[in-house]
Amino acid sequence: MKSIYVRLSTLAIAMAVSGWAAAETYIVDRYQDDTDKGALRWAIQQANSKPTEASEILIQAVGKAPYAIKVNSPLPEIKAPVKIIGTQWAKTGEFIAVDGSNYIKGTGVEACPGAVEGQFGTNVRTTTLPGIVLRDINGVTIQGLEIRHFCIGILMNRASNNLIQNNRIMHNYGGAGVMLTGDDGKGNPTATTTNNNKVLNNYFQDNGDGLELTRGAAFNLVANNHFISTAANPEPSQGIEILWGNDNAVVGNKFENYSDGLQINWGKRNYIAYNELTNNSNGFNLTGDGNIFDSNKVHGNRVGIAIRSEKDANAHITLTKNLIWNNGKDIKRCEAGGSCVPNQRVGAIIFDIPGLEHAHFVGSRGHGVKIDPANLQKTCNTSDEQGCNAQPNQNIQAPKLTLSKGQITAEVKAQPNQRYQVEFFGNTSANSNEAEFYLGSAVAATNAQGTATLTWKPTTQVASVTATLTDRVGATSELSSAVKLK
């Protein structure tokens, strides 16, 4: 008997050391915003009182739907590895709301001041008036909630290894629905503080930006979310903005009705794949080096993929297997992005679309933002111009396509003695100059004069064919002019 007791005691100690000890659970079954037992504020305080221990906050459905906890002042920041779960979602798909409208007052975006005095709303630096705050903390889960009427729905500031899943994020007009930022408190990025977070299967509606990955946010996964803006949104800016964020994966999301579905500002090596972007002014609005855009569906926008000029003349962006159709719509929506320049080129892939850092940008740069005109950027039109940015994406030129006897000839004019990849796309209309279907690829190697010719025969019945050219480091051209097969 004594030996059994010793073995059980040893097992209990081992379980405790290995983290098998039962996590504390706090039940929220009162929607009053106070510190009495059963309130959300009380539950967060209890979890925070044990900052090294994992726990759960289970928010129950109380009364009849819709279920809402209206908070009267900022909630405590999350300081412990806790799971905060609205329990009704797993039962019926209904969300339990956490609502900030009782204490965030004002007219629209004016209720949300930025970090710089006189600035407010979306597209200014801000961490102001968030709903749920994860700062300098790891291992938090948020599920089954509707988070609404804050300036930022969820702020993840220098926070890693957290999960935001199966929530509805709505009407957070100031900063973003969810903001992942490495901001050090002074606007500087931190490289290793906001990593390996997952934002999965959420619905974002009518936030300023839907989601932001900024100031060093890296190696995060944003997947299978729906980002949508409606007429109720005072600043339909970006579905996702990546600002100085690197090595993130954005996969399988949908973006509708923004100035830009997704905008990258000088982020590097982000992988953006299998997303759908429709009814935006720009589907993608891009700068940065080493970003890859793979197998996205881009349709019904003014510009499908816009690539801006930037100060880094070596920056390159890779476009591969993207399906692009029915763009060129008259969608002039330009909140810190979009394409509203009169008479500009529109369509599938367009270089030198101006952003808010460019002198010829037309639109809002953010409320209260003042930029010295001398600091605004311009794009060089000739190779000998000074004081301007080089043409985007290495100024790589699309191949020239011709058709003869059912075969397509692609002529490449580029750098000498280099490997290039030509991707071919098809369209259902003979008059289309886009990329509705991906048909295949071929390799071309240029000679000492920088030219190459290859022949390729389509195996799929299409009415017209276009192509892009990608160099050995990953810079991709605009689409070629189409050849008609019918």
Label every PLM stretch briefly:
Residues 23-153, 158-160, 299, 323-460, ...:
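N-terminal, post-signal-peptide segments of secreted/periplasmic proteins
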Residues 1-9:
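Bacterial N-terminal signal peptides that target proteins for export
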Residues 10-11, 21:
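Cleavable N-terminal signal peptides
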Residues 79-80, 136-137, 142, 158-160, ...:
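Parallel beta-helix/beta-solenoid
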Residues 151-156, 173-180, 206-215, 231-243, ...:
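Short glycine/acidic-rich loop motifs that flank beta-strands on beta-rich extracellular proteins
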Residues 474-486:
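Edge beta-strands of extracellular beta-sandwich domains
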